[in-house]
């Protein structure tokens, strides 16, 4: 299960960083413009530790994504059958 947690954090990290770059927004400008501490953003993009849902939600909204859009990106990023229990 620990491995799945890591995969999830890494998927969130990749999506957040890619979407910010796709918008052409510099790291510091993104954080300052959306009142997101750089340490919080660092934790998310480096998949360093569990980040609160509030902080992830704040970043998702700052990226101008709906939660549905973010979920779709997450589904594409995660391996097939990601949460399926072993039989």
Each language-model region and where it sits:
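Short, charged recognition helix plus adjacent turn
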Residues: 1-3, 71-87
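Residues within the helices of the helix-turn-helix
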Residues: 17, 28, 39, 57, ...
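DNA major-groove recognition helix of helix-turn-helix
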Residues: 20, 45, 55, 74
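Short, basic-rich loop-to-helix N-cap that marks the start of a DNA-contacting helix
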Residues: 48-61
């Amino acid at each position: 299960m620990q491995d799945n947690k890591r995969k999830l954090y890494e998927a969130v990290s990749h999506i957040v960083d890619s979407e910010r770059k796709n918008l052409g927004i510099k790291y510091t400008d993104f954080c300052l413009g959306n009142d997101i501490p750089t340490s919080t953003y660092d934790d998310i993009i480096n998949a360093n530790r569990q980040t609160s849902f509030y902080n992830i939600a704040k970043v998702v909204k700052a990226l101008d994504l709906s939660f549905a859009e973010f979920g779709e990106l997450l589904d594409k990023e995660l391996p097939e059958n990601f949460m399926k229990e072993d039989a």
